[in-house]
Structure formats: C-alpha cells, structure tokens
C-alpha cells in the first residue's frame, strides 16, 4: 500500500537563496534567526531557552539548514543521529508567494510573473473598484492600500461596522484581500463579494494569484480577531500537478487538510477537511492518515507559522509553534507504514526578524521519512519540483515536466 503524507510548515525557510538579492532578502533565515533569538534568551515569551526541536533534528532539519547556510543554527544539535533523508531546495518560480511555492512542490513551477498592486496608497485601479461597488451593490469601500491584516482592522474595523463598507487591501504578494465582520457584514455576503472580485480580476486580465476573504469578529479596535473562516480563491495551476495526475491516471485520492484545496483551486483534490490552529490541523491530519487507503496523498498546510507569527514578526510565537509541532511529530511518524513516505517541507520563508511584514526568498527544508527511505543528505535541490517528481515516480504516474526524483 503506497501513501504519501505531505506536511507544509507554511513559511519555514532555512536560509536565503542564491537569488535573494532580487527580492531584498539577502541574509534572511527564518529558522536561523529564530534559533539565534531563542539561544540569546530573546524569545522567552510563553516558552524558554534554546529552540528545542529534537524530532525535526532527527529528520535532518539542522543538517539541511547547515547545507543551506554553512552554519549550525544557534543552540541546536548538529551531531544528532539522522533517521531521514534531507535536502534544501531552491525555488525556480519567479515569486515567493504561497501558490507559487505549493504549485512548484506539486511539480508545476510558476515561470510567469504574477500581477501586483504595487502602489502603497490607492492601490487598486478605479475601474476595478467601480465595478465591485456596482456589481455587489456596496455603499463604498475602505482601505485601498497595502497593509498588515491585523493593523488595518484596528484602523478601519469600527468604521467598517458602522458603514457596511468592506475593507480592501493588498501586500507585496499577488493578492486582493477583503476584510469584513462576520456578524455585521455576514460571512456568505463576504464570500459572494470575493467571488465577484475573482471574476472581475480574471476578466480584467490583472493576473492576480488570489482573492482572500478575511472575516473577523470583535466590537472595537484592539479586540478585533480574524476567524478561521478565511477562504482563498486562487487561479488554477497552469498545468496538471502530481495531485491531478494521481487522481486522473491512477484513480488515487488526495485529501486536503487546511487551506491546500484553496491553493490548488480544488484541482486534484478529492476530499477537503477544514481545521484551524496547529493542534486542530494535527488532529485532522492524524485522522486522515489513519483512514487513508492505497494511492492516497494526505496534504496539510500548517498556516499559522506564516499568518500568525511570520507576517506578524513574532519570533517567540513562531518558536513556540515549532516546538508544539515537534512535540506532536512522533504521532505522525508512528502512522507511517512499510511503503509510506512522510515529507516535511515549506513553501517560502517569512523571517520574523526581518524588516517589513512580507515573505522572504529562502531555501525550504525537504525532510523525507519512511521505513524504505535511506537516511542521509540529498543535497541542494534546484527546484521544489523535485518533490513533485519524487511523488510521480513513487506513485507511477507520468513524469512531471520539471524536477528530479530524489529517492
């Protein structure tokens, strides 16, 4: 029975890539800078001491980081016995965003340039805004700028509740984000607005990767909170991913846990499981792993590393999340059967010590574990698509156009 379990620690980069200068990210290192802060006692908020990731270390994380950066992360064990295969991978795609990273993991790098809204104020074309107001029958809109999602709620959340005007904002990513109050505006109404925005962006030729619904609750600035009902409306990958090939060619199954289905625009997904928060995502993943039959991929995105700690530049929170993940990792490893493979990886970096609030262009870890996987270094990989090609070979689908089999 062949099954693959893919766990994406969203934004968990392990050192700047060779082309990081194109992105202003030379020197970025999500893992390294978190470990450094922990070792100095600068991340003792809710946790204490050096970064403690014994299980990820045994799977080769510290070695992969050393391969990427040339140094061992502060306070971590560079001499631990390694029981998995490990690598550090460079991104072939032109961006450092979520869809590009995930699509490339599944064998389809993004070799075109996304469209972006680069103006920090008055970010969106007036023609687009006018169409949204008219089609969705809106009283107007707020925002129309670049912003952190939590900051803009404190700035405009109360006005949104009073006026019913949705909050439109973007970032350095190829995104159009809409924040609305779940109760006063309504979740269904927000989703409908996002569908309209997706249609207008596509028909207008803006080439924007995602429209993101950002629902929130609360009654005043300072206590607004985003909920787990986020919904991403992505464009479809430009070619069949390994997920699609497994379903189409082998009548296989692909289970999405968390936001995976949204990222792939539901292409190649046979079952969707929603969960919010690290523990809930872990619980859902464990249940799906236990239920998984032959020719199945269980694919989970642990979004909190990116959304809750990376973008918010919360080093202690990120460290605490990693330690929780590591504590629970043996539960996943115990479910890996004789012919199964477990792959732990990331989709980009988001160094919480870095300037600004955006992603960072970094190598990602590729940690592969299974009874038949030979432990040791798989070296520097030229593309995340090596993961997709490895899965294509493992399941016996037609090969992907990019990437090399690592096993």
UniProtKB/Swiss-Prot annotation:
Q: Which InterPro entries match?
A: Alkaline_phosphatase_core_sf (IPR017850), DeoB (IPR010045), Metalloenzyme (IPR006124), Phosphopentomutase_DeoB_cap_sf (IPR024052)
Among the GO biological process terms of this entry, one is: 2-deoxyribose 1-phosphate catabolic process
Q: Which UniProt keywords apply?
A: Cytoplasm, Isomerase, Manganese, Metal-binding
Any single Pfam family the record assigns to this protein: Metalloenzyme
- GO CC entries: cytosol
Q: How is the cofactor bound?
A: Binds 2 manganese ions.
Report the superkingdom from the record.
Bacteria
Q: What is its main location?
A: cytoplasm
Q: Which reaction does it catalyse?
A: 2-deoxy-alpha-D-ribose 1-phosphate = 2-deoxy-D-ribose 5-phosphate; alpha-D-ribose 1-phosphate = D-ribose 5-phosphate
EC numbers for this chain = 5.4.2.7
The record's subcellular location field reads:
Cytoplasm
Provide the family line. Answer: Belongs to the phosphopentomutase family.
Which HAMAP family does the record match to this protein? Answer: Phosphopentomut
Q: What is this protein called?
A: Phosphopentomutase
Record organism = Salmonella arizonae (strain ATCC BAA-731 / CDC346-86 / RSK2980)
